[in-house]
């Protein structure tokens, strides 16, 4: 059997890591050949028009489908570069050959104008509640931070694609990395879904859960320093509490908001309560993180499958997470999450719970659903790569 795996980019972020992992684990399956299609397969065209409808990408994909003749097509991301132009190409090939097609839902572009499920009332990034997806009033939610005209054009394009291309209908099964994504699709009437947890990096060496007795905790933030990541809001809460339960926050990463935060919280930096460590490679990062008591994940957008929760568990650390969107439910079975709401009382309660958690020497974290082996077995079953896996698929689908 031959599988064609498709993604916008070869290397960029988390979705690309999952793309490459899916290729590797499928190639390791007996009797399976794998071909790939991404940015390297055609001449890149710059500009917004190409992103809206990338005709060169569609023509290149049609040629690859004819040449490779796959029985399965697995798509990761397409709307950032390949564009919706490739969806009719896949649909036509399916109708002609009986091939089965699958989409891994790395973001929310099938259900809302903003793929991060964000709105911008008064310019402030705010997550859209899932129940709003079923209401017509979502049309009036500002989905872009770039102004009313850009927002209107974005919505017009989204509705045109939804009506004319119907991307959700082109795939036999939508693979959801989190229960929250599955629920979001269900709110828009999309039920052909199955859970497929993204795999965590195999480069990590598992460590025993860390214990700490101190009253004031040493926290670490990992990721892009951008508004939707919520670092500013978390630091505001911590500063308002005079860092009563927090000894320090170390920020690993970079981004467009870093300079602003360095100015805004200069007093915290001078006092040694806030430190910007910049970007580190994975090997150095996970060694450095082990020196902290816990990670903080303060995102103000819904997220989808924040693997930092799993990675923290693997190196023995708990995570203080903003109780919002997918963060509220993703990884609950692992046992290393402490939730907080965006107010001082909730943060204080969560920090007290975190201190108690860190003092429990017998605690254990379970990340078995996020291993490469589990991902490989589940993906093979969902793609029905053998008769046995096809028989086993029904009880596994959600």
Regions found by a protein language model. Give the residues of each.
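Nucleotide-activated donor-binding/catalytic signature segment of Leloir-type glycosyltransferases, i.e.
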Residues: 262-280
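Membrane-proximal helix-turn-helix segments that form the acceptor-binding/catalytic region
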Residues: 109, 121-173, 183
């Amino acid at each position: 059997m031959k599988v064609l795996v498709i993604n916008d980019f070869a290397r960029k972020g988390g979705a690309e890591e999952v793309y490459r992992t899916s290729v590797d684990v499928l190639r390791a399956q007996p009797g399976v050949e794998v071909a790939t299609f991404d940015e390297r397969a055609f001449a890149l065209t710059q500009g917004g028009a190409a992103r809206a409808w990338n005709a060169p990408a569609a023509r290149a994909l049609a040629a690859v489908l004819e040449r490779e003749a796959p029985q399965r097509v697995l798509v990761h991301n397409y709307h950032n570069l390949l564009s919706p132009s490739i969806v009719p190409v896949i649909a036509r090939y399916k109708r002609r050959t009986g091939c089965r097609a699958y989409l891994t839902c790395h973001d929310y572009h099938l259900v809302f104008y903003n793929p991060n499920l964000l709105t911008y009332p008064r310019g402030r990034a705010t997550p859209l509640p899932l129940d709003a997806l079923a209401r017509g009033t979502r049309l009036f939610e500002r989905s872009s931070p770039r102004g009313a005209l850009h927002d209107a054009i974005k919505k017009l394009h989204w509705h045109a694609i939804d009506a004319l291309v119907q991307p959700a209908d082109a795939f036999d099964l939508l693979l959801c990395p989190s229960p929250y994504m599955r629920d979001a699709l269900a709110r828009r009437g999309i039920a052909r879904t199955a859970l497929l947890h993204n795999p965590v990096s195999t480069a990590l060496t598992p460590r025993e859960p860390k214990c700490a007795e101190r009253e004031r905790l040493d926290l670490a933030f990992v990721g892009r320093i951008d508004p939707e990541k919520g670092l500013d809001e978390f630091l505001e809460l911590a500063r308002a509490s005079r860092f009563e339960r927090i000894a320090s926050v170390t920020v690993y990463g970079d981004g467009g908001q870093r300079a602003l935060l360095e100015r805004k919280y200069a007093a915290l930096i001078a006092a040694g309560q806030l430190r910007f460590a910049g970007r580190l490679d994975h090997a150095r990062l996970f060694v450095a993180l082990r020196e902290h008591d816990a990670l903080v994940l303060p995102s103000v957008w819904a997220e989808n499958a924040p693997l930092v929760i799993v990675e923290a568990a693997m190196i023995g650390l708990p995570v203080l997470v903003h109780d919002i969107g997918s963060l509220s439910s993703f990884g609950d079975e692992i046992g290393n999450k402490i939730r907080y709401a965006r107010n001082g009382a909730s943060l204080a309660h969560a920090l007290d719970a975190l201190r108690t958690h860190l003092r429990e020497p017998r605690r254990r974290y379970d990340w078995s659903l996020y291993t490469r082996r589990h991902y490989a077995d589940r993906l093979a079953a969902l793609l029905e790569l053998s008769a046995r896996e096809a028989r086993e698929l029904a009880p596994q689908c959600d």
